[in-house]
């Protein structure tokens, strides 16, 4: 029972410490949300669908 207060204090100290990144950020670090890869992928897929003459709803497209 003597260890319980010590355990509680340690847990409170751990919870109150600020989170720190494992590695420092560099000027080249970009958050994933700022990438436009999904827009580019959609544009490329739309171009491929148009080249293959697929239906508008893409149900007749056979990718393979």
UniProtKB/Swiss-Prot annotation:
Keywords, A to Z? Amidation, Disulfide bond, Neurotoxin, Secreted, Signal, Toxin
Where in the body, by tissue, does this protein show up? Expressed by the venom duct.
Pro-peptide region(s): 23-52
User: What's the PTM story here?
Assistant: Contains 2 disulfide bonds that can be either 'C1-C3, C2-C4' or 'C1-C4, C2-C3', since these disulfide connectivities have been observed for conotoxins with cysteine framework V (for examples, see AC P0DQQ7 and AC P81755).
Q: Does the keyword ATP-binding apply?
A: no
Keyword Lyase annotated: no
Give the sites modified to Isoleucine amide.
63
The UniProt entry's GO CC annotations, sorted and at most eight, read:
extracellular region
**Subcellular location per the Swiss-Prot or TrEMBL entry:** Secreted
What are the recorded GO MF terms, alphabetically?
Answer: toxin activity
User: According to the UniProt entry, where is the signal peptide?
Assistant: 1-22
Q: According to its UniProt record, where is this protein mainly located?
A: secreted
Question: What's the domain of life for this entry?
Answer: Eukaryota
Report the domain remarks. Answer: The cysteine framework is V (CC-CC).
Name the family the entry cites.
Belongs to the conotoxin T superfamily.
Put simply, this protein is called: Conotoxin Ts-011
Q: What is the lineage of its organism?
A: Eukaryota, Metazoa, Spiralia, Lophotrochozoa, Mollusca
């Amino acid at each position: 029972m003597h260890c319980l207060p010590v355990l509680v204090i340690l847990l409170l100290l751990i919870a109150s410490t600020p989170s720190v990144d494992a590695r420092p950020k560099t000027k080249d670090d970009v958050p994933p949300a700022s990438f436009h890869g999904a827009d580019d992928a959609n544009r490329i897929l739309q171009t491929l669908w148009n080249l293959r003459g697929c239906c508008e709803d893409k149900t007749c497209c056979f990718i393979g």
